[in-house]
C-alpha cells in the first residue's frame, strides 16, 4: 500500500511539474521571429495536429518576402474542460498502470468483486499496461487537438481554419498579406484632420 501511495505521489508531482512547464501541450517558449519592427503576424496553431511544420514553412517564406513583419506562433489551446480531462487521464493512466504492476485490487477496497478485465490484466500485465497507456494517450490527444490554424495581422483576423475548414495555400496567404499591407500603407498615407 505504501508503494502504491508513493507511486501516486510521484505521478502527481510529475504531472504538476509537466503542467507548469508545458500547460496543456503549449510549447514553453513561443515561436518568434526576433528583430523585426513592422506589423505583427500571429499564428495560433494546433501543435498536436502536426501544423508546426506548416507554420515553419510559412514563416520562412513570409520572412523572406516581408522582412519587416514580426512573426509569432503559439499553440491554440482547447477548451478548459478538455484540458482538464486530458490532465486527469494522464494521472489516472499512471495510477492504473501502477496498480496493474503492483497487483493490488482496487475493487476490494470498495468491497466489490473484480471484473474479468481486471483479472485478465493481472494475468497479462505487459499487454494490459500497454493497452492502458496507448488508449489513454489516444483519448488525451483527441482532447488536446483543436484543428486550429488561426492567423491574425496586428490582432485583426485574416484567416481561420476553424471557420473555413482548410489551411490557406501559400498563394492565398501572400495575397491576403499583400492586400493588408497595401491597405495599411494607403491608410497611413491619408492625412488626419483635426476637427
Swiss-Prot record:
According to the record, the segments passing through the membrane are: 85-103
Which GO MF terms does the UniProt record name?
selenium binding; thioredoxin-disulfide reductase (NADPH) activity
Q: Please provide the record's keywords in A-Z order.
A: Endoplasmic reticulum, Membrane, NADP, Oxidoreductase, Redox-active center, Selenocysteine, Signal, Transmembrane, Transmembrane helix
The cross-references to Pfam families, in alphabetical order and at most eight, read:
Rdx
Q: How does it sit in the membrane?
A: Single-pass membrane protein
In which tissues has expression of this protein been reported?
Ubiquitous. Highly expressed in the endocrine pancreas.
Q: Which InterPro entries match?
A: Selenoprotein_Rdx-typ, Selenoprotein_T, Thioredoxin-like_sf
Please provide, in alphabetical order, the Gene Ontology terms of the cellular component aspect for this entry: endoplasmic reticulum; endoplasmic reticulum membrane
As its record notes, the protein acts as a catalyst of: [thioredoxin]-dithiol + NADP(+) = [thioredoxin]-disulfide + NADPH + H(+)
EC number from the UniProt entry:
1.8.1.9
Q: What induces it?
A: Induced by Parkinson disease-inducing neurotoxins such as 1-methyl-4-phenyl-1,2,3,6-tetrahydropyridine (MPTP).
Q: Where in the cell is it found?
A: Endoplasmic reticulum membrane
Catalytic class of the enzyme: oxidoreductase
Q: Which GO terms describe its biological process?
A: cell redox homeostasis; cellular oxidant detoxification; glucose homeostasis; insulin secretion involved in cellular response to glucose stimulus; pancreas development; positive regulation of cytosolic calcium ion concentration; positive regulation of growth hormone secretion; response to glucose
Among Gene3D superfamilies, the record links this protein to:
Glutaredoxin
Modified how? May contain a selenide-sulfide bond between Cys-46 and Sec-49. This bond is speculated to serve as redox-active pair.
Where do we see the Cysteinyl-selenocysteine (Cys-Sec) cross-link in this protein? 46-49
Instruction: Tell me where the signal peptide lies.
Output: 1-19
Give a short account of what the protein does: Selenoprotein with thioredoxin reductase-like oxidoreductase activity. Protects dopaminergic neurons against oxidative stress and cell death. Involved in ADCYAP1/PACAP-induced calcium mobilization and neuroendocrine secretion. Plays a role in fibroblast anchorage and redox regulation. In gastric smooth muscle, modulates the contraction processes through the regulation of calcium release and MYLK activation. In pancreatic islets, involved in the control of glucose homeostasis, contributes to prolonged ADCYAP1/PACAP-induced insulin secretion.
- Report the family membership: Belongs to the SelWTH family. Selenoprotein T subfamily.
Involvement in disease: mRNA levels are increased more than 200-folds in the caudate putamen from Parkinson disease (PD) patients compared to control subjects. In conditional brain knockout mice, treatment with PD-inducing neurotoxins provoke rapid and severe parkinsonian-like motor defects.
Q: What is this protein called?
A: Thioredoxin reductase-like selenoprotein T
Amino acid at each position: 500500500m505504501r508503494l502504491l501511495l508513493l507511486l501516486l505521489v510521484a505521478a502527481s508531482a510529475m504531472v504538476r511539474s509537466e503542467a507548469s512547464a508545458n500547460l496543456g501541450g503549449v510549447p514553453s517558449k513561443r515561436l518568434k521571429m526576433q528583430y523585426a519592427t513592422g506589423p505583427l503576424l500571429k499564428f495560433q496553431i494546433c501543435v498536436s495536429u502536426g501544423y508546426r511544420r506548416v507554420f515553419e514553412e510559412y514563416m520562412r517564406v513570409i520572412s523572406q518576402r516581408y522582412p519587416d513583419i514580426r512573426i509569432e506562433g503559439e499553440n491554440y489551446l482547447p477548451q478548459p474542460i478538455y484540458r482538464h480531462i486530458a490532465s486527469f487521464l494522464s494521472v489516472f493512466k499512471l495510477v492504473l498502470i501502477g496498480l496493474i504492476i503492483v497487483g493490488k485490487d482496487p475493487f476490494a477496497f470498495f468491497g466489490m468483486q473484480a471484473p474479468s478485465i481486471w483479472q485478465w490484466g493481472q494475468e497479462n500485465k505487459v499487454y494490459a499496461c500497454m493497452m492502458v497507456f496507448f488508449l489513454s494517450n489516444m483519448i488525451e490527444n483527441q482532447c488536446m487537438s483543436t484543428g486550429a490554424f488561426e492567423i491574425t495581422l496586428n490582432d485583426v483576423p485574416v484567416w481561420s481554419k476553424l471557420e473555413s475548414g482548410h489551411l490557406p495555400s501559400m498563394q492565398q496567404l501572400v495575397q491576403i498579406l499583400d492586400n493588408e499591407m497595401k491597405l495599411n500603407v494607403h491608410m497611413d498615407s491619408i492625412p488626419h484632420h483635426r476637427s
